[in-house]
Amino acid sequence: MKFEKPKKKIIDWYGSKVSVPFNCHIYPEKKVKIANRFNGEECTMPGYAVAVYDTIIGAERFEDWDTVRAGLDWFRCHFAKEYMVLLDLSLIHI
């Protein structure tokens, strides 16, 4: 299956312009609590960041590695702590 390269999207987030790494459905909630799928550790993020997280997980499932990489890079830059909790597999002890 061939995927398009992800394209950045600018959204209006409660009066602020925010850039997300690809076009995805943005959740309207200001804050969402989400848990690491392997160890249950939780963190709270804005809805747009959770939308990016969910897109990364879905892209992983479909082996769309360009989207996964774009999302991971964005998370490391904009939500470093949350990246470490939710997405940095080197810290997960299964």
Can you annotate each of these PLM segments?
Residues E4-V50:
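N-terminal acidic leader/helix
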